Each structure stands twice: as structure tokens, then as C-alpha cells.
Amino acid sequence: MTVSPENPVYNGGQQIPSVAVQVGDTILKENDQYQLSYAQMVGGAAATFDPATDTTALVNAGTYYLYITGQNGYSGKIQKEYVIAQKDISDAAVEVTLQDNIDWDKVLADAAADPDNASATLTSCIKEVKDTARTDADAVDGVKNLVEGTDYTISLSKTGRGITLTGTGNYTGERY
């Protein structure tokens, strides 16, 4: 069994894999010689879904399972993992725009002086964070604004002289 793409990265859109099943020299036909089903682990149990009718399936980063079950002269069941990887927040398609006329010395000093409110202080410096390579329906011309707390968190850098965005949810990595 081959599945493509092999290593998709989160892009906001549904990523239904192309599946080819071959036994010897015979390429099997879906719904004739085998059935294809999908599942994802939810709360410790496999939740099945049909990506043709559930447009929210195979969208988010995570591990999914494809099951091939033989029929009409073919028997057995094959399980294949299909992983949609988190997108790295340091990817060039993720753009960070800062507010104009920021007094960085004051902002960084305020954030360092009050660590409990550092995130709010630093957030006020960011105009927007957006992903310019999205394929989901609610992206406008491939661009979607990211949401703090859902797609990234913000903190004072380890040096105390800058900010760090840390990917969360469908995003991973750090951006300084």
C-alpha cells in the first residue's frame, strides 16, 4: 500500500491522501477489491470518519489511521498511519507585523518587571501574525490571521531583550 503525500504539513485545508493498493502485479480497485476507512484516536478510542462527507476531517495536525480491508477474493486488513505534521511558526509563510513606534526598552522593562502580565504587555506590540500559505475555505487569498492562545503563545525571550512566539495547536517551533 502506498499513501501520498507521505509527509503532509498542516496548511489549514483538508488533506485526503491518495491510496494505491497492489498485490503482486495487480492494482486493486477501491470499493471493489478493498474498502478504505479512516479513524483518529479521540480520548483513547478510535473514532471513524468519512472525509468525503466530513470536511473537518484530515485538516488538523495529528495522527490518523487508514484501514484497507480486502473483499471479493481478497482478505485481511492493513493499518497505515497518516500524520499531518504541525507547521513550524518560523516558516517564511508565517509573517509577524509589529505595531509602529514601539519603545522597546520600556516594553521589555515592563514585561520583565511584571512576569505575570508579560504576555499581555508583549501582545500589545504585535499588529498581526498571519499564515500566507493556507488552503482552508475561510482564508482570504491564502492568508489567515493566527490567534494567540490557539496558534501561538507569546513570551519574553530568554535573554529578556526580545519576544518569542511559540507555536501551539497546528503550529510548532519558536520564532524570535
Feature map (PLM): residue ranges:
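Solvent-exposed beta-strand/loop surfaces, strongest in extracytoplasmic domains of secreted
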Residues: 1-176
